[in-house]
Amino acid sequence: MWVTSTVTPETAPNDAFVPDQDGISDKVLDRMGVTVTSTSPMMSFRNNFNTEMSMGIFWDGYVLEVSAPMISGGAFLDITDPHVGGSFVSGGYTGEIDSTAMNPLAGRMAWSGNSGGYIDTVINMGPNLAGQTVTLRFRMATDAAVAAPGVHIDNISITGASCP
């Protein structure tokens, strides 16, 4: 489960944290009701991750997804899906979750491995979300074995959108 943590936030007093557990899991952190007001919305955040990876193989990781009624009918798609139109400016996904892993994200690009501390991620959310009220979610998934410290996300900012 994602929790509010005060242990190692980038900025006080807290951040969002999810551990990388040693069992199959699929955990989400949603932000509902983001109204996109621009044709060039941008999202930025700081993230610090240490997820299971061994010998260059990514076993656990997390992604950013969006649900937009006029694009996906409410289904969640990756922020980089062509229908969404988003792209990373910096700090994008680091590897593909192994396709043989018993991980709900198997075969998908994700943030995985060890970031070595907080890094900046900047995303051009693309023009396709303009005029829609969307739900954004971070989705962390793990395979059946080996725990790691987990994921911290802090300082989320979205321009070209309003959040109630």
Question: What is each model feature region?
Answer:
Residues 1-164:
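Beta-sandwich/jellyroll recognition modules and their flexible linkers
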